Amino acid sequence: SAQKNGPSAPASSQTVQSDSGSATENSVEIRTYDIPEENVQAGTRYVPSPTTGGFWMWTLFIQNYIQAYDPVTKSTYIPCYQTGCEHSDAFCSAYFGEISGLAEYRGNFYAMIYYNDDTASAFVTRPVSGGPLQILASWEPENDNEVYRCGFYGLSFGKAYLTVSKETYTLTEDGQQELVGEEYSDCSFDLKTGKMMELMRDVDGTLPYMYGVWEDSVVYQTLETVKGAPAFEDWVAQQPEGTPWDLYGRQYYNYRLYSRNLKTGDEKTIVDMSENFVWTADPHKSWEQYIVYQVGRSVYVYDMETQTVKELFTYDQDWKNYNYMILDGHVIAICGTGDTCRAWAIDIADESVVELDTRGGNAITITPEYECNDYIVGLLANQTGKVEEYYISKEDFYRSNYDGIFS
Protein backbone atom coordinates (compact mmCIF):
# COMPACT_ATOMS: atom_id res chain seq x y z
CA SER A 1 0.00 0.00 0.00
CA ALA A 2 1.11 3.56 -0.63
CA GLN A 3 2.81 5.55 2.09
CA LYS A 4 2.34 9.27 2.57
CA ASN A 5 6.03 10.10 2.99
CA GLY A 6 7.45 8.01 0.18
CA PRO A 7 6.80 5.32 -2.38
CA SER A 8 5.49 1.88 -1.47
CA ALA A 9 7.93 -0.38 0.35
CA PRO A 10 11.11 -0.96 -1.64
CA ALA A 11 11.40 -4.23 -3.54
CA SER A 12 15.17 -4.44 -3.08
CA SER A 13 18.12 -2.35 -2.02
CA GLN A 14 21.88 -2.19 -2.49
CA THR A 15 24.76 0.20 -1.78
CA VAL A 16 26.52 2.13 -4.54
CA GLN A 17 28.89 5.07 -4.74
CA SER A 18 27.24 8.44 -5.33
CA ASP A 19 28.53 11.76 -6.59
CA SER A 20 25.69 14.26 -6.49
CA GLY A 21 25.70 17.71 -7.97
CA SER A 22 26.18 19.32 -4.57
CA ALA A 23 27.66 16.69 -2.27
CA THR A 24 30.96 14.88 -1.91
CA GLU A 25 31.20 11.27 -3.05
CA ASN A 26 29.67 8.95 -0.48
CA SER A 27 28.04 5.57 -0.15
CA VAL A 28 24.29 5.58 -0.81
CA GLU A 29 21.84 2.73 -0.47
CA ILE A 30 19.89 2.40 -3.71
CA ARG A 31 16.39 1.02 -3.41
CA THR A 32 14.22 -0.21 -6.25
CA TYR A 33 10.43 -0.38 -6.15
CA ASP A 34 7.66 -2.52 -7.57
CA ILE A 35 5.35 -0.88 -10.08
CA PRO A 36 2.45 1.13 -8.58
CA GLU A 37 -0.84 -0.57 -7.72
CA GLU A 38 -2.82 2.65 -8.30
CA ASN A 39 -2.47 5.45 -10.85
CA VAL A 40 -1.69 2.63 -13.27
CA GLN A 41 -1.12 4.16 -16.69
CA ALA A 42 -2.10 2.41 -19.91
CA GLY A 43 0.67 1.58 -22.35
CA THR A 44 0.93 1.36 -26.11
CA ARG A 45 3.88 -1.05 -26.55
CA TYR A 46 5.17 -2.41 -23.24
CA VAL A 47 2.80 -2.88 -20.30
CA PRO A 48 4.18 -3.94 -16.90
CA SER A 49 2.64 -7.06 -15.38
CA PRO A 50 2.38 -7.33 -11.59
CA THR A 51 1.21 -10.92 -12.15
CA THR A 52 4.26 -12.14 -14.08
CA GLY A 53 6.84 -9.52 -13.07
CA GLY A 54 7.60 -8.90 -16.73
CA PHE A 55 5.91 -7.13 -19.64
CA TRP A 56 2.96 -7.55 -21.97
CA MET A 57 3.88 -6.50 -25.51
CA TRP A 58 2.34 -6.06 -28.95
CA THR A 59 2.98 -4.13 -32.15
CA LEU A 60 0.67 -1.11 -32.12
CA PHE A 61 -2.07 -1.21 -34.80
CA ILE A 62 -0.46 -4.26 -36.44
CA GLN A 63 -0.61 -7.11 -33.94
CA ASN A 64 -4.07 -7.88 -32.49
CA TYR A 65 -2.86 -10.20 -29.73
CA ILE A 66 -0.45 -9.71 -26.86
CA GLN A 67 2.74 -11.52 -25.94
CA ALA A 68 4.42 -11.89 -22.55
CA TYR A 69 8.11 -11.19 -22.03
CA ASP A 70 10.06 -12.43 -19.00
CA PRO A 71 13.28 -10.38 -18.62
CA VAL A 72 14.64 -12.86 -16.06
CA THR A 73 14.64 -15.81 -18.48
CA LYS A 74 14.71 -13.53 -21.56
CA SER A 75 11.84 -15.53 -23.03
CA THR A 76 8.68 -14.57 -24.91
CA TYR A 77 5.42 -16.49 -25.02
CA ILE A 78 1.79 -15.95 -26.04
CA PRO A 79 -0.67 -16.22 -23.10
CA CYS A 80 -2.95 -18.64 -24.97
CA TYR A 81 -3.21 -22.32 -24.20
CA GLN A 82 -5.38 -23.54 -27.08
CA THR A 83 -3.65 -26.02 -29.35
CA GLY A 84 -3.37 -24.71 -32.90
CA CYS A 85 -4.85 -21.29 -32.06
CA GLU A 86 -4.09 -18.57 -34.61
CA HIS A 87 -4.81 -15.78 -32.08
CA SER A 88 -7.17 -14.09 -34.51
CA ASP A 89 -10.52 -13.94 -32.69
CA ALA A 90 -12.01 -13.20 -29.27
CA PHE A 91 -12.05 -16.89 -28.30
CA CYS A 92 -8.27 -16.61 -27.87
CA SER A 93 -7.24 -15.34 -24.42
CA ALA A 94 -4.38 -13.33 -25.97
CA TYR A 95 -6.52 -11.62 -28.63
CA PHE A 96 -7.96 -8.13 -28.14
CA GLY A 97 -8.31 -6.63 -31.61
CA GLU A 98 -6.74 -3.32 -32.56
CA ILE A 99 -5.36 -2.11 -29.23
CA SER A 100 -4.76 1.60 -28.71
CA GLY A 101 -3.96 1.26 -24.99
CA LEU A 102 -3.76 -1.57 -22.44
CA ALA A 103 -3.12 -2.01 -18.71
CA GLU A 104 -3.12 -4.80 -16.16
CA TYR A 105 -4.97 -3.85 -12.98
CA ARG A 106 -6.12 -5.96 -10.02
CA GLY A 107 -5.78 -9.23 -11.92
CA ASN A 108 -7.53 -8.09 -15.09
CA PHE A 109 -6.61 -6.68 -18.48
CA TYR A 110 -8.29 -3.44 -19.54
CA ALA A 111 -7.93 -2.09 -23.05
CA MET A 112 -9.26 0.50 -25.47
CA ILE A 113 -9.70 -1.06 -28.90
CA TYR A 114 -10.74 0.26 -32.32
CA TYR A 115 -13.00 -1.61 -34.73
CA ASN A 116 -15.21 -1.07 -37.81
CA ASP A 117 -12.22 0.23 -39.81
CA ASP A 118 -11.11 2.42 -36.90
CA THR A 119 -14.39 4.34 -36.78
CA ALA A 120 -15.62 2.89 -33.46
CA SER A 121 -14.08 2.31 -30.02
CA ALA A 122 -14.72 -0.08 -27.16
CA PHE A 123 -13.38 -0.32 -23.61
CA VAL A 124 -12.91 -4.02 -22.87
CA THR A 125 -11.64 -6.35 -20.15
CA ARG A 126 -10.77 -9.96 -19.43
CA PRO A 127 -9.03 -11.74 -16.54
CA VAL A 128 -5.27 -12.15 -16.84
CA SER A 129 -5.85 -15.85 -16.16
CA GLY A 130 -7.91 -16.06 -19.37
CA GLY A 131 -11.57 -15.91 -20.30
CA PRO A 132 -13.91 -14.17 -22.72
CA LEU A 133 -13.44 -10.55 -23.75
CA GLN A 134 -16.10 -8.37 -22.11
CA ILE A 135 -17.18 -5.01 -23.52
CA LEU A 136 -17.60 -2.45 -20.73
CA ALA A 137 -18.43 0.55 -22.92
CA SER A 138 -18.50 1.29 -26.64
CA TRP A 139 -18.89 4.25 -28.98
CA GLU A 140 -20.11 3.86 -32.55
CA PRO A 141 -20.72 6.57 -35.18
CA GLU A 142 -24.27 7.42 -36.20
CA ASN A 143 -23.29 8.02 -39.84
CA ASP A 144 -20.38 7.66 -42.27
CA ASN A 145 -19.07 11.14 -41.46
CA GLU A 146 -18.33 10.39 -37.80
CA VAL A 147 -15.39 8.64 -36.17
CA TYR A 148 -14.87 7.65 -32.52
CA ARG A 149 -11.22 7.10 -31.58
CA CYS A 150 -11.23 7.13 -27.81
CA GLY A 151 -8.28 7.26 -25.43
CA PHE A 152 -7.34 5.40 -22.26
CA TYR A 153 -5.23 7.17 -19.61
CA GLY A 154 -5.23 4.42 -16.99
CA LEU A 155 -6.82 3.18 -13.77
CA SER A 156 -6.83 4.30 -10.16
CA PHE A 157 -8.84 3.28 -7.09
CA GLY A 158 -11.39 1.22 -8.98
CA LYS A 159 -12.00 3.65 -11.84
CA ALA A 160 -10.76 3.87 -15.41
CA TYR A 161 -10.00 7.27 -16.94
CA LEU A 162 -10.96 7.61 -20.59
CA THR A 163 -11.12 10.28 -23.28
CA VAL A 164 -14.17 10.10 -25.53
CA SER A 165 -13.15 11.48 -28.91
CA LYS A 166 -15.66 12.21 -31.68
CA GLU A 167 -14.52 13.63 -35.01
CA THR A 168 -16.75 14.69 -37.90
CA TYR A 169 -15.53 14.75 -41.50
CA THR A 170 -16.86 15.91 -44.85
CA LEU A 171 -15.78 15.01 -48.38
CA THR A 172 -14.08 17.73 -50.40
CA GLU A 173 -14.62 18.19 -54.13
CA ASP A 174 -11.58 16.05 -54.89
CA GLY A 175 -12.87 13.21 -52.71
CA GLN A 176 -10.62 13.80 -49.69
CA GLN A 177 -11.86 13.72 -46.09
CA GLU A 178 -11.72 17.06 -44.30
CA LEU A 179 -12.09 17.42 -40.54
CA VAL A 180 -14.95 19.82 -39.77
CA GLY A 181 -15.78 19.07 -36.13
CA GLU A 182 -14.15 17.78 -32.94
CA GLU A 183 -15.69 16.88 -29.58
CA TYR A 184 -13.62 15.57 -26.68
CA SER A 185 -14.44 14.78 -23.08
CA ASP A 186 -12.58 13.21 -20.17
CA CYS A 187 -14.60 10.60 -18.30
CA SER A 188 -14.25 8.23 -15.39
CA PHE A 189 -15.69 4.71 -15.58
CA ASP A 190 -16.49 2.90 -12.32
CA LEU A 191 -15.31 -0.69 -12.74
CA LYS A 192 -17.71 -1.97 -10.07
CA THR A 193 -20.95 -0.18 -11.01
CA GLY A 194 -20.31 0.48 -14.70
CA LYS A 195 -21.21 4.15 -14.23
CA MET A 196 -19.62 6.61 -16.66
CA MET A 197 -19.14 10.17 -15.39
CA GLU A 198 -18.02 13.08 -17.54
CA LEU A 199 -15.25 15.06 -15.86
CA MET A 200 -14.81 17.87 -18.39
CA ARG A 201 -15.48 18.81 -22.01
CA ASP A 202 -13.03 20.31 -24.46
CA VAL A 203 -12.62 24.02 -25.08
CA ASP A 204 -12.00 24.84 -28.76
CA GLY A 205 -11.08 21.24 -29.51
CA THR A 206 -8.50 20.78 -26.74
CA LEU A 207 -8.48 19.11 -23.33
CA PRO A 208 -5.97 19.58 -20.52
CA TYR A 209 -3.26 16.92 -20.39
CA MET A 210 -3.79 14.50 -17.50
CA TYR A 211 -0.63 14.01 -15.43
CA GLY A 212 -2.06 11.59 -12.87
CA VAL A 213 -5.00 10.70 -10.63
CA TRP A 214 -5.09 9.53 -7.02
CA GLU A 215 -8.40 8.89 -5.26
CA ASP A 216 -10.41 12.10 -5.87
CA SER A 217 -7.43 14.23 -6.89
CA VAL A 218 -6.40 14.63 -10.52
CA VAL A 219 -3.54 16.77 -11.84
CA TYR A 220 -3.83 18.45 -15.24
CA GLN A 221 -1.61 20.61 -17.40
CA THR A 222 -2.98 23.32 -19.66
CA LEU A 223 -0.98 24.99 -22.41
CA GLU A 224 -1.70 28.17 -24.32
CA THR A 225 0.38 29.71 -27.10
CA VAL A 226 0.94 33.42 -26.58
CA LYS A 227 -0.59 35.77 -29.12
CA GLY A 228 1.69 36.65 -32.02
CA ALA A 229 3.93 33.59 -31.60
CA PRO A 230 5.57 32.39 -34.83
CA ALA A 231 4.90 28.89 -36.12
CA PHE A 232 7.35 26.41 -34.63
CA GLU A 233 8.80 25.49 -38.05
CA ASP A 234 9.40 29.17 -38.88
CA TRP A 235 11.02 29.76 -35.51
CA VAL A 236 13.37 26.77 -35.92
CA ALA A 237 14.50 28.02 -39.34
CA GLN A 238 15.57 31.34 -37.80
CA GLN A 239 17.57 29.90 -34.88
CA PRO A 240 21.34 29.35 -34.80
CA GLU A 241 22.59 25.78 -34.83
CA GLY A 242 22.46 24.11 -31.41
CA THR A 243 19.46 26.07 -30.13
CA PRO A 244 17.46 23.76 -27.80
CA TRP A 245 14.05 23.08 -29.31
CA ASP A 246 12.29 23.54 -25.96
CA LEU A 247 13.36 27.21 -25.97
CA TYR A 248 10.34 27.79 -28.20
CA GLY A 249 8.05 26.53 -25.46
CA ARG A 250 9.77 28.62 -22.82
CA GLN A 251 9.30 31.72 -24.97
CA TYR A 252 5.83 31.20 -26.40
CA TYR A 253 3.89 28.72 -24.24
CA ASN A 254 1.95 29.55 -21.10
CA TYR A 255 1.82 26.46 -18.88
CA ARG A 256 -0.31 25.81 -15.84
CA LEU A 257 -0.12 22.70 -13.68
CA TYR A 258 -3.07 22.34 -11.33
CA SER A 259 -4.92 19.83 -9.17
CA ARG A 260 -8.66 19.33 -9.27
CA ASN A 261 -10.90 17.64 -6.71
CA LEU A 262 -13.22 15.35 -8.65
CA LYS A 263 -15.91 15.51 -5.95
CA THR A 264 -16.04 19.25 -5.33
CA GLY A 265 -14.58 20.63 -8.56
CA ASP A 266 -12.18 22.81 -6.56
CA GLU A 267 -8.94 23.65 -8.36
CA LYS A 268 -5.53 24.62 -7.01
CA THR A 269 -2.60 25.86 -9.08
CA ILE A 270 0.59 23.91 -8.42
CA VAL A 271 2.85 25.93 -10.73
CA ASP A 272 2.46 28.25 -13.71
CA MET A 273 4.52 30.63 -15.81
CA SER A 274 4.54 33.29 -13.09
CA GLU A 275 7.38 31.12 -11.76
CA ASN A 276 10.34 29.95 -13.83
CA PHE A 277 8.61 26.67 -14.72
CA VAL A 278 10.81 24.30 -16.74
CA TRP A 279 8.67 22.09 -18.94
CA THR A 280 9.60 18.55 -19.99
CA ALA A 281 8.53 16.63 -23.06
CA ASP A 282 9.23 13.33 -21.30
CA PRO A 283 6.02 11.30 -20.79
CA HIS A 284 7.05 10.07 -17.32
CA LYS A 285 5.51 12.91 -15.32
CA SER A 286 3.61 10.81 -12.77
CA TRP A 287 4.39 7.71 -10.69
CA GLU A 288 2.18 6.33 -7.93
CA GLN A 289 0.85 9.41 -6.07
CA TYR A 290 3.65 11.72 -7.20
CA ILE A 291 3.94 14.39 -9.89
CA VAL A 292 7.33 15.81 -10.89
CA TYR A 293 8.07 19.32 -12.15
CA GLN A 294 10.92 21.84 -12.15
CA VAL A 295 11.13 25.53 -11.28
CA GLY A 296 14.42 27.26 -11.97
CA ARG A 297 17.23 24.95 -10.84
CA SER A 298 15.06 22.97 -8.41
CA VAL A 299 13.08 19.79 -9.04
CA TYR A 300 9.91 19.21 -7.01
CA VAL A 301 7.46 16.40 -6.37
CA TYR A 302 3.78 17.05 -5.69
CA ASP A 303 2.00 14.42 -3.58
CA MET A 304 -1.57 13.97 -4.85
CA GLU A 305 -2.59 12.18 -1.65
CA THR A 306 -1.42 14.80 0.85
CA GLN A 307 -1.56 17.69 -1.66
CA THR A 308 1.85 18.84 -0.50
CA VAL A 309 5.01 19.81 -2.40
CA LYS A 310 8.56 18.73 -1.62
CA GLU A 311 11.72 20.26 -3.08
CA LEU A 312 13.70 17.15 -4.00
CA PHE A 313 16.86 18.26 -5.80
CA THR A 314 18.65 21.47 -6.77
CA TYR A 315 21.36 21.76 -9.42
CA ASP A 316 24.52 23.45 -8.16
CA GLN A 317 24.72 25.73 -11.22
CA ASP A 318 22.67 26.94 -14.18
CA TRP A 319 22.63 24.73 -17.28
CA LYS A 320 21.61 25.39 -20.86
CA ASN A 321 19.32 22.35 -21.10
CA TYR A 322 17.20 20.50 -18.55
CA ASN A 323 15.02 17.43 -18.55
CA TYR A 324 13.44 15.25 -15.87
CA MET A 325 11.27 12.19 -15.42
CA ILE A 326 9.82 10.02 -12.66
CA LEU A 327 9.72 6.23 -12.38
CA ASP A 328 10.58 3.46 -9.90
CA GLY A 329 10.16 5.80 -6.93
CA HIS A 330 12.95 8.01 -8.29
CA VAL A 331 13.20 11.29 -10.15
CA ILE A 332 15.80 11.32 -12.91
CA ALA A 333 17.19 14.86 -13.22
CA ILE A 334 19.15 15.65 -16.38
CA CYS A 335 21.08 18.76 -17.41
CA GLY A 336 23.73 19.75 -19.88
CA THR A 337 24.90 21.78 -22.83
CA GLY A 338 25.12 20.83 -26.46
CA ASP A 339 28.34 18.92 -25.72
CA THR A 340 27.94 17.58 -22.19
CA CYS A 341 25.33 15.90 -20.03
CA ARG A 342 24.98 15.07 -16.34
CA ALA A 343 22.20 13.06 -14.73
CA TRP A 344 21.16 12.01 -11.23
CA ALA A 345 18.64 9.59 -9.74
CA ILE A 346 16.97 10.86 -6.56
CA ASP A 347 14.93 8.56 -4.31
CA ILE A 348 11.65 10.28 -3.44
CA ALA A 349 11.41 8.60 -0.03
CA ASP A 350 14.79 9.43 1.51
CA GLU A 351 16.08 11.99 -1.04
CA SER A 352 19.32 10.03 -1.53
CA VAL A 353 21.16 10.94 -4.73
CA VAL A 354 23.32 8.92 -7.10
CA GLU A 355 24.91 10.33 -10.24
CA LEU A 356 24.44 8.32 -13.43
CA ASP A 357 27.44 7.83 -15.72
CA THR A 358 26.80 9.50 -19.08
CA ARG A 359 30.09 8.18 -20.51
CA GLY A 360 31.15 11.72 -21.35
CA GLY A 361 28.38 12.04 -23.90
CA ASN A 362 25.88 14.81 -24.52
CA ALA A 363 22.87 12.68 -23.52
CA ILE A 364 21.88 10.27 -20.76
CA THR A 365 23.34 6.88 -21.68
CA ILE A 366 20.09 4.96 -21.28
CA THR A 367 16.81 6.85 -21.49
CA PRO A 368 14.15 4.86 -19.59
CA GLU A 369 10.95 4.22 -21.55
CA TYR A 370 9.14 1.49 -19.59
CA GLU A 371 9.56 -0.34 -16.29
CA CYS A 372 8.40 -3.55 -14.66
CA ASN A 373 9.20 -4.59 -11.09
CA ASP A 374 12.93 -5.19 -11.57
CA TYR A 375 13.79 -4.07 -15.10
CA ILE A 376 13.77 -1.02 -17.35
CA VAL A 377 13.36 -0.86 -21.11
CA GLY A 378 15.36 2.07 -22.41
CA LEU A 379 16.99 3.70 -25.40
CA LEU A 380 20.76 3.31 -25.48
CA ALA A 381 22.79 5.94 -27.31
CA ASN A 382 25.94 4.30 -28.65
CA GLN A 383 29.17 5.82 -29.92
CA THR A 384 27.90 6.10 -33.52
CA GLY A 385 24.86 8.09 -32.45
CA LYS A 386 22.53 5.23 -33.30
CA VAL A 387 19.78 4.73 -30.71
CA GLU A 388 18.56 1.21 -29.93
CA GLU A 389 16.19 -0.33 -27.38
CA TYR A 390 17.59 -2.51 -24.59
CA TYR A 391 16.66 -4.07 -21.27
CA ILE A 392 18.60 -3.39 -18.10
CA SER A 393 17.96 -4.32 -14.48
CA LYS A 394 17.11 -1.39 -12.24
CA GLU A 395 20.15 -2.16 -10.09
CA ASP A 396 22.47 -2.07 -13.10
CA PHE A 397 20.85 1.17 -14.29
CA TYR A 398 21.52 2.95 -10.99
CA ARG A 399 25.06 1.52 -10.85
CA SER A 400 25.61 2.70 -14.46
CA ASN A 401 26.61 -0.88 -15.26
CA TYR A 402 25.80 -0.69 -18.94
CA ASP A 403 27.59 -3.99 -19.54
CA GLY A 404 24.45 -5.51 -18.02
CA ILE A 405 22.18 -4.49 -20.91
CA PHE A 406 20.56 -7.05 -23.18
CA SER A 407 18.08 -7.01 -26.04
Region annotations inferred by a language model:
Residues 1-13:
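Sec-dependent signal peptide cleavage junction
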Residues 110-111, 161-162, 189, 260-261, ...:
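Hydrophobic transmembrane helix bundles of membrane-integrated enzymes that assemble
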Residues 40-50, 89-104, 142-157, 204-215, ...:
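Repeated scaffold domains used in trafficking and secretory/extracellular systems
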Residues 19-38, 64-89, 117-142, 170-203, ...:
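Surface-exposed loop/turn elements that mediate protein-protein interactions on large endomembrane-trafficking
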Residues 57-59, 110-112, 161-164, 219-222, ...:
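Residue position within the beta-strands of beta-propeller blades
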Residues 27-63, 211, 284:
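N-terminal export/targeting and maturation segments
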Residues 14-21, 25-34, 97, 101, ...:
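Intrinsically disordered, low-complexity prosegments and terminal tails associated
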Residues 211-212, 218-220, 254, 284, ...:
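C-terminal regulatory/effector modules of DNA-binding transcriptional regulators
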